[in-house]
Amino acid sequence: MVVRTQNSESKIKEFFEFCKENEVEFVDFRFSDIKGTWNHIAYSFGALTHDMFKEGIPFDASSFKGWQGIEHSDMILTPDLVRYFIDPFSADVSAVVFCDVYDVYKNQPYEKCPRSIAKKALKHLRDLGLGDVAYFGAENEFFIFDSIKIKDASNSQYYEVDSEEGEWNRDKSFENGVNFGHRPGKQGGYMPVPPTDTMMDIRTEIVKVLNQVGLETFVVHHEVAQAQGEVGVKFGDLVEAADNVQKLKYVVKMVAHLNGKTATFMPKPLYGDNGSGMHTHVSIWKNNENLFGGETYKGLSEFALYFLGGVLRHARGLAAFTNASTNSYKRLIPGYEAPSILTYSASNRSASVRIPYGISKNSARFEFRFPDSSSNPYLAFGAILMAGIDGIKNKMDPGEAMDINLFKLTLDEIREKGIKQMPHTLRRSLEEMLADKQYLKEGQVFSEEFIQAYQSLKFHSEVFPWESKPHPFEFITTYSC
């Protein structure tokens, strides 16, 4: 038997007992591809053996973009019994197990497996002696629409989303003949009570289901945009936090679906309204001590500021992982509480990095406000950690904090102050990443092979098609030329 997992005999025994106690009929093995899509393969419980949790489960990796060619398609899923749960949506009782991907040709964890990359980033932090754990906490915003229509043909390009909350429905006659008229309006949706908030019951249902699958929630509310919401979940270590993002997205989409609606974590689905981010909180701990707490700006340590310096230094290329879609850059524009200016401040939501208010050293952390949920959380969190590590190693100065409303600065003022901005396109962020990738490759965390596979996937599946397709707005500006 070839042992490819770190599952102990006691862990395997514990899992089988869990399945028997819960009368599990199927075990659903789930893994994330490069883009961040959660995929699965299910086995009936009676077909499982203990050896499968040691040796792994074979699958065809050539069916996933950016992974293997058909001539070397065999890969192995390695179950990780650190984390599993009962799927609250399956008709038959199913246990969900997180998996990594193992390379049978090199006899090692697959270098293009996002979850394995996240684990390597955490290991790199420990190997350098810089910390025992990196805690991450994500705030994933989302939209819940009543319906969506999309067309992508050679002679027609359009989309249409709809929501009872939409200001475009003020004059609509609904099927019941009633239009109640209570709507938040553009940028008016932050925390109103019902009936303006039509999604309260769906959000509370989401919270209940999240608790069932082991996610501790602490806040739930309507967000600024029409049809937008947020559910806050407790932080965890880097890998756990990324696992939690996958859980959260699955639950939100499924609860919406079962309520006859459709949920999206797309960064900017509505023109003229706020977009959805994935604000990411980070701190590093060693010997049960928060290394970010100290005596410098707003209770931060010098160690923390160096970490921040690394993230700000590499942010333009880092965006290839944290803002991983062409749509991401329609969110990162002034005027919609989206942080496009690369600086930091305390309690200032116009900065790309915020230092949240805290009453103790243990609460010292950064909130990186530029990431969004189109990213693969394993890659986004791993890349943020690698940038911060580079900042610590090389003592990168983040510069002075800017405690002003940055949205009011003109482009000339931004240039005069020497402040960098986030890239304006996915193409530019990928180009910046390719020109600034050495810090990612330290400790063999992000391999050159993975980086090339990632950029190729993004260029061919998103950048090139987006650049080559006529846009409806171009017909307004150019058709009569």
From Swiss-Prot:
Domain of life of the native organism: Bacteria
Molecular function via GO: ATP binding; glutamine synthetase activity; metal ion binding
UniProt EC number: 6.3.1.2
SMART domains: Gln-synt_C
Cofactors that this protein relies on: Mg(2+)
InterPro entries found in the cross-reference section: Gln_synt_N (IPR008147), Gln_synt_N_sf (IPR036651), Gln_synth/guanido_kin_cat_dom (IPR014746), Gln_synth_cat_dom (IPR008146), Gln_synth_gly_rich_site (IPR027303), Gln_synth_I (IPR004809)
Protein known as: Glutamine synthetase
Gene from which the chain derives: glnA
